[in-house]
Amino acid sequence: FLVADGSMLRAYNEGFEKYNIEDGNFRVKKELASSQKKDISAHNVTLYQNFYIEQAVDNGSTMRFFKNRNDVNRVCLMKGTLPTKSDEIAIDRMYADNNHISVGDVLTSGGKKWKVTGFVALPDYSCLFQNNNDSMFDAVKFGVSVVTPKGFETLNQDKLQYSYSWLYDKAPKNERQEKKMAEKFMESLGKKVSLEAFVPRYQNQAINFTGDDMGSDKAMMIVLLYIVIVIMAFVFGITISNTIRKEAG
């Protein structure tokens, strides 16, 4: 278990650089103007559009649709292929497993049929939290997916959420500095736009929960092993003591 957990935790940590995971994200009511983007970028950050639309799926769940990402929060293809047509979709692997969906199946959302071409993992949704303040994730009733830009345009645009991801031009050295940078950025950002949500990476459950969970499991198993060793030592000690007494008698 410890070897497997260590390997998974190492792969998880390496994914931050491999998939260029965001330093945070924020959501606004309407799309930012070019002048606003320029002003915000002057605070030593690079902005990336990460717009999404949520729609109900015919199986009773909610799907969050994204365009395929190439720059930040890059997609990890687990099985099959990424969508290339406007009626194709690649969905989160865990969501697919929990809802018994296979590559080649068809999902219906908003009256449109989507052919599942592959299973993916989105690095900013390593755990499927629909809202960051949720007490627990739900990989059954909530899923994430990627579609082509043309496919995205066929969705209900009235439900479009203007979410932006950011990366610091110079990465923080530690979590303490990261918190200070995030607080300063939020303060500056709040003077320029009306924020609907602001989630720095260190507070993002969808990104951090998996790593935190694996780390805590490892610590718990180590403590458990120590307890087992102490118990075994006690039992062996009693057994040896009794054996010596019998032999002496």
What are the residue ranges of the model-derived segments?
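Membrane transport/envelope proteins' first extracytoplasmic loop
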Residues: F1-G237, N242
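Short cytoplasmic-facing helical segments at TM-TM junctions of multi-pass membrane proteins
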Residues: I244-G249
